[in-house]
């Protein structure tokens, strides 16, 4: 059986009833896979490449991953937090070095690393126009690292921006955690989260 391991942040992590309706990509991926492929999701809310590694979250992946498995690597949202030294990474130095650590962990075990650029934040300046992307430096750094290390890359950043442009500002509120007050026990005060 092939396993897809995920390393990432809240946009990927498995959520339960306590955080519903938040849903990570890795949480629902198995719905689109054949039965002989399983998902093992190690993504954790709020993590950057730095904090994920510093907290030894890569270790259990390394211990379990085997030849023919995949390691999907999706970070950027929290790496860009300059005021948080436990998470911040410079996009063109630390971030790229950390991405290489994930690649090496997979390849050392005969597995396949795959980079996935961060999902774009919902950043409209009006109903039809998106602001300049918030993750551009990290997207560029991931693309450069993918090229340098010959790692396949899925450009979720560009795809998500294109879909947001087509849908418009109001419709995309449904795709993000824009929650009305009094509806969800996990967010009784409501929530306007564009991540």
PLM features: residue spans?
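Gly/Ser/Thr-rich beta-alpha loop segments that engage phosphate groups in nucleotides
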Residues: 10, 48, 78
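Structural motif
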Residues: 48-56
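Alpha-helical cap/lid subdomain in secreted, periplasmic
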Residues: 57-195
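Residues that cap or flank secondary-structure elements
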Residues: 17, 21, 53, 94, ...
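Serine-esterase "nucleophile elbow" of acetyl-processing enzymes
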Residues: 1-44, 59-67
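Active-site environment of divalent metal-dependent phosphoester hydrolases
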Residues: 14, 49, 161
């Amino acid at each position: 059986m092939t396993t897809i391991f995920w390393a990432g942040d809240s946009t990927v992590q498995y959520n339960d009833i306590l955080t519903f309706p938040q849903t990570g990509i890795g949480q629902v991926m198995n719905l689109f896979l054949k039965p002989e492929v399983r998902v093992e999701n190690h993504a954790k809310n709020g993590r950057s490449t730095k904090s994920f590694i510093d907290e030894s979250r890569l270790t259990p992946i390394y211990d379990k991953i085997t030849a023919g498995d995949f390691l999907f690597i999706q970070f950027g949202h929290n790496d860009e937090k300059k005021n948080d030294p436990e998470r911040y990474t410079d996009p063109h130095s630390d971030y790229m070095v950390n991405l290489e650590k994930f690649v090496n962990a997979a390849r050392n075990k005969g597995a396949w690393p795959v980079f996935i650029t961060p999902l774009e934040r919902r950043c409209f300046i009006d109903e039809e126009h998106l602001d300049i992307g918030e993750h551009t430096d990290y997207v560029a750094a991931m693309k450069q690292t993918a090229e340098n290390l010959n790692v396949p890359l899925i450009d979720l950043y560009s795809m998500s921006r294109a879909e947001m442009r087509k849908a418009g500002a109001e419709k995309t509120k449904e795709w993000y955690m824009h929650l009305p007050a009094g509806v969800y026990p996990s967010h009784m005060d409501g929530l306007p989260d564009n991540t």
